[in-house]
Amino acid sequence: MKVLRAKSAGFCWGVERAIEITRDYAHQGRKPVYTDGPLIHNRQMMEKLSEEGIREVGDYQSRANIAVNPAAPGENPVMVVRAHGISPERRNYLKSLGMDFKDATCPDVGIIAGKIRLHAKKGYATIIFGDKNHPEAIGLLGYTEGRGYCITSKADIDALPALERVCMVSQSTMFMHEFAELSEYARQKFKEVLVFDTICQATKDRQTDVVALARQGAQAIVVIGGHHSANTVKLASLARLQNLPTYHIETAAELSPEEMKKFTVIGVTAGASTPEFLISEVCAKLEAL
């Protein structure tokens, strides 16, 4: 079987950076190291990080189970903000816990937050093309000074109140063509709309590469990554739009040899939070068929 691997499959630089920052603290013996929610949306990678003393914590409201000594900051547990970023309010709360605080927000997400903050202070409302339940979008809404709206469709735009001045951005992992369509619709709807294309280059590259796999002769596409990873789900959706059988899996164990043997050429891609070892295992299994 011939396996066509997408050029940009796997970790983006923002995810690599967040993992490196977190691991550095763990390897210094600074344990436990906490992350505010899952560092990345990949269960297998989170399990590996857990073995290294890196613990995911949820939306806890007190210091009850975390020992902190304000007089010895260098000896305290470390709290790492994940790549998706957080709101200013959340940042202040985490800092108030007294742990050593480290921000691993992806710089691309930080740029989006900066654009929102700047224009919110100038009186602009903010429209974010994104999933209102995704941690990145939740964090970005915190910079809008209470005038932020998450949308995913023209109907969502139609439901917005009358807005005079709008700053429009995108969650970094969304579809390029949808953002272009909705930003143009917003321009027709509101008096002044400043549009900033904030879909990150890693997302664009991965989406472009999926289309390229179809053009290179792939008869089916395997997309590797967490089922809760927004960018991986988008890749799988885009692969299906190429009218190719598409298999969204997390590990090689999910591949059905009988199903895969129907094809002689298979394209393989992976989300920005998928580690290399998972991609290699899938490619090896396919090539052995």
Curated annotation (Swiss-Prot):
InterPro entries, per the entry: LytB/IspH
Coiled-coil residues: none
Active site: 136
Binding annotation for (2E)-4-hydroxy-3-methylbut-2-enyl diphosphate: 41, 84, 134, 172, 229, 231, 273
GO BP of this protein: dimethylallyl diphosphate biosynthetic process; isopentenyl diphosphate biosynthetic process, methylerythritol 4-phosphate pathway; terpenoid biosynthetic process
GO MF entries: 4 iron, 4 sulfur cluster binding; 4-hydroxy-3-methylbut-2-enyl diphosphate reductase activity; metal ion binding
Top EC class of this enzyme: oxidoreductase
UniProt binding sites for [4Fe-4S] cluster: 12, 106, 200
Role, per record: Catalyzes the conversion of 1-hydroxy-2-methyl-2-(E)-butenyl 4-diphosphate (HMBPP) into a mixture of isopentenyl diphosphate (IPP) and dimethylallyl diphosphate (DMAPP). Acts in the terminal step of the DOXP/MEP pathway for isoprenoid precursor biosynthesis.
NCBIfam families in the record: ispH_lytB (TIGR00216)
Official protein name in the record: 4-hydroxy-3-methylbut-2-enyl diphosphate reductase
UniProt lineage: Bacteria, Pseudomonadati, Verrucomicrobiota, Opitutia, Opitutales
Gene: ispH
